[in-house]
A protein has these predicted regions:
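Collagenous Gly-X-Y triple-helix signature in extracellular proteins
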Residues: 1-190
Length: 190
């Protein structure tokens, strides 16, 4: 008989697949999975969505892409403020200077089905090869599977962004609709 257990320990380094628990300022506890090692740190993505849903933009446009979106500003303001000062001090900024961001379509699926093509350097995160890791609960006590945003605007559309549907498949949604988010952050190497 095999028994699968969970061990809790203090660590300085992480490996892909490790899961950490984070308590947010509003009392919500979330889990984040290590998904990719980079030179300056380990990228983590929330296992499930935050309990609240958000639109990508308040107006029906995807002009400017993720970089110009209302949700990007909210992630690095109001939502970042939910994270503890201790965790924020451990975070390394992404290339654009943000401490929180959304995953991209290629990081989740390994290719761009609906979004504009990403760099050849962007690879699918190893845990996302399993469909179950692409699926996310809604972050509430009801534990419904949730649609969530990705950082890619849909190619040839003026008002859609790529999303992941409840079944863990690539899809898209109108930017003014509210769906889940799985923030991604990077913890510095020690």
């Amino acid at each position: 008989m095999k028994v699968k257990g969970m061990i809790e320990s203090d660590v300085d380094t992480f490996k892909v697949g490790d899961v950490i628990e984070v308590k947010l300022a509003d009392g919500v506890k979330v889990q984040a999975m290590a998904v990719q090692q980079e030179e300056d740190g380990m990228i983590f993505c929330l296992v499930d969505c935050l309990p609240s849903e958000h639109p990508m933009n308040s107006t029906s446009t995807n002009e400017g892409g993720y970089e110009e979106s209302s949700l990007r500003k909210k992630l690095n303001g109001e939502i970042l403020n939910l994270f503890s000062a201790e965790l924020k001090a451990m975070m390394a900024p992404f290339n654009n200077g943000d401490l929180l961001r959304l995953p991209t379509e290629k990081e989740i699926f390994g290719q761009n089905y609906y979004g504009e093509c990403e760099s050849l350097c962007v690879k699918q995160w190893k845990p996302m090869k399993k469909r179950r890791n692409r699926m996310a609960f809604d972050g509430t006590k009801y534990e419904n599977f949730q649609w969530y945003w990705l950082a890619n605007k849909v190619e040839d559309s003026a008002f859609r962004f790529v999303s992941v549907n409840a079944g863990g498949n690539a899809d898209y949604y109108n930017v003014t609709n509210s769906i889940g988010i799985r923030p991604t952050f990077k913890i510095k190497n020690h």
